[in-house]
Structures are given as structure tokens and as C-alpha cells.
Amino acid sequence: MQQSTLLKPVSCYGIGVHSGKRTQLTIEPAKENTGIIFIRTDISSENNYIEASYFNVSDTLLSTTISNDHKVQISTIEHLMAALWGCSIDNAIIKIDGPEVPIMDGSSKPFVFMIECAGKKLQNAPKKYLKILKDIKVVHKDCELYCTPYDHMTVDLTIDFASKAIGRQNLTFSKQESFNQNIADARTFGFTKELDYLQSKGLAQGASFENAIGIDEQDKILNPNGLRYEDEFVRHKLLDLFGDLYTSGTSVVSSIKGYKTSHALNNELLHRIFSDTTSYKFVTNSEL
């Protein structure tokens, strides 16, 4: 299995769900072993490069934000990262003229469409995988996420919300190639009772029914067209998990189980993995 990048650049415009700012984003091809690199094109006075790595994650409140040593940051990268993972793109340069990745429709599907339009190019370097060698678990109150050694990637994820519109949902997933058809179009969601508070804190400035599922205080789905799936909520949480795990630099080969996961928990798991060199190794496809 070889590494891959895009055949040609592809661009989009959109607003940030939290900043409310309109930005242009371009995904460009990159050389072998580059990984995923973000560049803030609106900043030229200092280092504007940020590697999409777990160790550059600086904030996990409602989304995943990465920063560099110069405190240049880009937020809400997880939906784009999930699309890159789902399309098996190992190397890409992402140029953006603002502080936040556009939310698009609240899912990864628009980014998947962009990548498919650009096309994929195989490269002259072997693809590497992060193989887990021992059990690793992170817990915060009643939320937990753990991974165990396994010969391929499989995920069992459960969410549990007090809202009757969501409730308890479970989903298992084991085929990366089915991400684009079954997970990528699951949208982010939020509660109207929290909107005023979030906006008072400078968050959710760009939120609308065009880019998120809205749930009111009577547990009613407010979007005119309803849900895309009965279990769209857990599908989106799985999407978030894949996007966050891709900040490891590659696909994780492990049996993963999560309960009430979050961006913070996802990132903590990667820190826990990489803090112990005996818990993982990078392998090629022939070594799986």
C-alpha cells in the first residue's frame, strides 16, 4: 500500500461555525512523507505553518484547534481531517485565509466531494499505520475511551444524552472504505438552550440549520428536513473521533471502544499512546 495525495488543488468558501468568519480553503497536493500541513495565508509576519498533529492541539472546547509556537492557530479541523482519513489522503497542504475551517453543511461530505473532484495520486513511498501493542485507556468522570491490540481497525462507540431526541445510541464500524458512504454526511448538532451562552462566549457565531442539527428544549429536531439517519448523532461522534485520531499522522490499527467521547478525550488518548514507546509501532501494510 502506497501513500497518496491529491492530483490537483481544490478550493471552497464557507463560514466558520464558531467564528462566523468567511474563509477560502484550498487543499493542495504534497510530497511523500509531508503529512497534513495547514498554512494561514492571511498571516505573513510570522510562522504561519501548523502541522496537523495531536501535539499541536491547543483547544478542544466544542472543536479541535491546532496552534504553532508563534500562537498562530486554526480551529475546527476535525471534519476536514476525517474526510482526509476517509479518502486515504496521507499528504496535503491546506491553505486557509482565516482562523477556522469552514463548517460547510456540518459534516465531512463536502470535503470528501472536493477530494474526489481533485482526484487521488499514489506516491512512491509506503503507507504507514500506527499499530497499537498494548491496552490503553483514558477516563474522565463517566466518559471513557480505550484501545486494545488488534489486526485491523474496529470501533465500538456509544453516546448517551439526556435529550430524548438523542438518547443512547451505539454504532460499530470496521471498514475505512465505507466511511464516505455511511459516516461522512452525519452532521454536527447543538441545543438551542445553549446557544445564547455559547454566543456570549464568542462561540457558535456562524451556527445555523444549514450547518448543524438544532434541538429545542422540548427535544424537537428543528431542521425542516429532519435527520439524515435515525442515529445521525452517534455517526457524527464517530466522524469526530476519526478526524481527531488522524492527528496521529496516520490510521490507527486497533480495537477502539468509546463511551461519551469528546475532542478532549480523543486527544488525550493519543498523548497517552505516544507517551509510551512500547505501546505502539509504525508498520507498513505487509507488517499488519
Curated annotation (Swiss-Prot):
UniProt-listed InterPro entries: Ribosomal_Su5_D2-typ_SF (IPR020568), UDP-acyl_GlcNac_deAcase (IPR004463), UDP-acyl_GlcNac_deAcase_C (IPR011334), UDP-acyl_N-AcGlcN_deAcase_N (IPR015870)
Active site: 263
Record's catalysed reaction(s): a UDP-3-O-[(3R)-3-hydroxyacyl]-N-acetyl-alpha-D-glucosamine + H2O = a UDP-3-O-[(3R)-3-hydroxyacyl]-alpha-D-glucosamine + acetate
Gene: lpxC
UniProt keywords, alphabetically: Hydrolase, Lipid A biosynthesis, Lipid biosynthesis, Lipid metabolism, Metal-binding, Zinc
Cofactor: Zn(2+)
Gene3D superfamilies: lpxc deacetylase, domain 1, lpxc deacetylase, domain 2
UniProt record similarity statement: Belongs to the LpxC family.
Record-given protein name: UDP-3-O-acyl-N-acetylglucosamine deacetylase
UniProt function note: Catalyzes the hydrolysis of UDP-3-O-myristoyl-N-acetylglucosamine to form UDP-3-O-myristoylglucosamine and acetate, the committed step in lipid A biosynthesis.
GO molecular function terms noted in the UniProt entry: metal ion binding; UDP-3-O-acyl-N-acetylglucosamine deacetylase activity
UniProt-listed HAMAP family: LpxC
GO-annotated biological processes: lipid A biosynthetic process
Superkingdom field: Bacteria
Pathway: Glycolipid biosynthesis; lipid IV(A) biosynthesis; lipid IV(A) from (3R)-3-hydroxytetradecanoyl-[acyl-carrier-protein] and UDP-N-acetyl-alpha-D-glucosamine: step 2/6
